[in-house]
């Protein structure tokens, strides 16, 4: 009977690779996400000279004149750093699950059949006689063996928008402090 050597097959499985390669891929994905964030800040937030890209908002603001009590429209301009109004992507892998299932199914069947048949014929005659003897033997053996192997690798990765790193939070805080509306007449208030 031909069968599977299950302990040997299980021992031959590259468990280090089956677990390690998905983990290595997750680390590479995390590094790729970090580089994507750096590229986003560089391409979206800074111009070619390294200066902060800004967006200018112009609008009319109502202002009360304390001496006359009149309300007037004042042209106001606000220049805001682009990075302060766009969500910066900080993606990280929150958790990862690796499931590996390896199944070996064996089945074997032996079937042996012996057939023996004999036939004896005798002739006897006066003087000169003849004897006829006939015998037959049959043997039939049937073996069937089947080994089914299947494996399944299931990887689940859960990525989330991470909290902003402290350095980026500090930088954006400084940029936000630089935002102040300015009146067109030069006497705008913050």
Curated annotation (Swiss-Prot):
Name by which UniProt lists this protein: Uncharacterized protein AF_0417
- InterPro entries listed in its UniProt record: DUF2589
């Amino acid at each position: 009977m031909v069968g599977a050597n299950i302990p040997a097959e299980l021992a031959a499985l590259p468990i280090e690779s089956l677990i390690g390669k998905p983990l290595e891929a997750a680390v590479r994905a995390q590094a790729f996400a970090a580089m994507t964030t750096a590229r986003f800040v560089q391409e979206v937030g800074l111009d070619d000279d390294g200066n902060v890209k800004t967006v200018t908002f112009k609008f009319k603001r109502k202002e009360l004149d304390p001496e006359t009590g009149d309300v007037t429209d004042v042209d106001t301009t606000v220049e805001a750093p682009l990075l302060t109004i766009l969500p910066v992507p900080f993606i990280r892998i929150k958790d990862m699950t690796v499931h590996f299932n390896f199944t070996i199914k064996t089945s074997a069947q032996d079937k042996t059949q012996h057939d023996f048949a004999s036939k004896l014929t005798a002739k006897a005659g006066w003087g000169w006689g003849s004897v006829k003897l006939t015998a037959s033997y049959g043997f039939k053996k049937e073996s069937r063996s089947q080994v089914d192997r299947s494996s399944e690798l299931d990887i689940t990765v859960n990525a989330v928008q991470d909290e902003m790193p402290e350095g980026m939070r500090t930088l954006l805080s400084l940029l936000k402090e630089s935002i102040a509306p300015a009146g067109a007449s030069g006497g705008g208030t913050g």
